[in-house]
């Protein structure tokens, strides 16, 4: 099975280590452009742009990077309750047209009650999912060209319509991740691709089976994706050393404060991530080559695949055999690690790469010449 592999734009910060300013890197537009252009050239299908008050606005970041990339798709956040579904549909159609069909949308209900209250959204977990279902029903229908009247518990619109349609028909695909029962119900009814964070394969298989069954009851099929960090090196020993270095400057106080902050979230997915490590740096390999160290201080995706190229590829294929066809990867720092993933992991996978533009030329497609006129020895193909 051909796999779609995305990268990640770290609009909330980047660096060599977690939980410290040592080795930290300023993230400005120039740096984000470097990462996006690297992902574009290396053959990643797209980039996920995060959302929330700790991040730059995902829509504006995507719009700023469209002109400097050629094939890369941008997965940006839809925020039910923060914006009207009709306005969001107009924005989505515009971004899709301006990007020449490179816009994808990620439904984000939110999981931090404090942040949501600051944004003016005062709904419980259950109410947020009710509102998200209403939002998505309207957003989809408006983008597909309908004139919509809708009277819901949380959202009411009359005569909602779109004058300028999206380029992708009937509309751009909708992605969504959530681990609660309500999230799975929403995914089964409304989205094209259901995302999970990187839990052990058995747990992921269970979630896929649940969503697949719920979707089948509605006469639908849903694709599946997974969000993971990757630490890949030429040898497994080097990869595990890199994992250890990533948290080398983390002290127990920083871990405790991070976990206390994340504990206020009402996100079931966040709770499942935290349960993998229990706030302790002991026994972080929670499944073969699946390392939970990132989640000690990072919210959201908190696990990484660790190993050499063939080993990480084998773990990727294990997830693919469960039905996952889309992998959203990241690594610290994101510029350098995009090259490592492309050079050390891609050769061992059947990667679905965007088509190269016609007429693209290469100065040296083979690496640096030997003694100025001898082609380098061809590497063995795996």
UniProtKB/Swiss-Prot annotation:
InterPro entries: Alkanesulphonate_mOase_FMN-dep, Luciferase-like_dom, Luciferase-like_sf, SsuD_RutA_monooxygenase. It catalyses: an alkanesulfonate + FMNH2 + O2 = an aldehyde + FMN + sulfite + H2O + 2 H(+). It is an enzyme of class 1 (oxidoreductase). Keywords: Flavoprotein, FMN, Monooxygenase, Oxidoreductase. Induction: Repressed by sulfate, cysteine, or thiocyanate. GO terms for biological process: alkanesulfonate catabolic process. Its EC number is 1.14.14.5. It comes from the Bacteria. It holds the Pfam family Bac_luciferase. GO terms for molecular function: alkanesulfonate monooxygenase activity. FMNH(2) which is absolutely required for this enzymatic reaction, is provided by SsuE. Catalyzes the desulfonation of aliphatic sulfonates. Belongs to the SsuD family. This is Alkanesulfonate monooxygenase. It comes from Pseudomonas aeruginosa (strain ATCC 15692 / DSM 22644 / CIP 104116 / JCM 14847 / LMG 12228 / 1C / PRS 101 / PAO1). The lineage of its organism: Bacteria, Pseudomonadati, Pseudomonadota, Gammaproteobacteria, Pseudomonadales.
């Amino acid at each position: 099975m051909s796999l779609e592999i995305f990268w990640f734009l770290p609009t909330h910060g980047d660096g060599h280590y977690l939980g410290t300013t040592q080795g930290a890197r300023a993230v400005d537009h120039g740096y984000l452009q470097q990462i996006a252009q690297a992902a574009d050239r290396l053959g990643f299908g797209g980039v996920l742009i995060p959302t929330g008050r700790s991040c730059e606005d995902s829509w504006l970041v995507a719009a700023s990077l469209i002109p400097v990339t050629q094939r890369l798709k941008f997965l940006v956040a839809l925020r039910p309750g923060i914006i009207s579904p009709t306005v969001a549909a107009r924005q989505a159609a515009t971004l899709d047209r301006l990007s020449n069909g490179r816009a994808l949308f990620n439904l984000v209900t939110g999981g931090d009650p404090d942040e949501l209250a600051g944004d003016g959204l005062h709904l419980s977990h259950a109410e947020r999912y009710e509102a998200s279902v209403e939002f998505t029903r309207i957003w989809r229908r408006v983008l597909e060209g309908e004139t919509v009247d809708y009277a819901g518990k949380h959202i009411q619109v009359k005569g909602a319509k779109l004058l300028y349609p999206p380029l992708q028909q009937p509309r751009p695909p909708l992605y969504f991740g959530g681990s609660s029962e309500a999230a799975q119900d929403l995914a089964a009814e409304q989205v094209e691709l259901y995302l999970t964070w990187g839990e052990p394969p058995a747990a992921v298989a269970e979630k896929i089976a649940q969503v697949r069954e719920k979707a089948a009851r509605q006469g639908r099929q849903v694709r599946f994706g997974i969000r993971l960090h990757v630490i890949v090196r030429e040898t497994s020993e080097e990869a595990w050393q890199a994992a250890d270095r990533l948290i080398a400057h983390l002290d127990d106080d920083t871990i405790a404060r991070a976990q206390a902050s994340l504990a206020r979230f009402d996100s079931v997915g966040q709770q499942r991530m935290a349960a993998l490590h229990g706030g302790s740096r002991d026994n972080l390999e929670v499944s073969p080559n699946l390392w939970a160290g990132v989640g000690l201080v990072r919210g959201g995706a908190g696990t990484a695949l660790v190993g050499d190229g063939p080993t990480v590829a084998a773990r990727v294929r294990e997830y693919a055999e469960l039905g996952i066809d889309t992998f959203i990867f990241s690594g610290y720092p994101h510029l350098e690690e995009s090259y490592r993933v492309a050079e050390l992991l891609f050769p061992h996978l059947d990667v679905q790469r965007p088509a190269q533009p016609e007429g693209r030329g290469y100065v040296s497609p083979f690496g640096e010449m030997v003694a100025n006129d001898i082609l380098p020895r061809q590497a063995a193909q795996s």
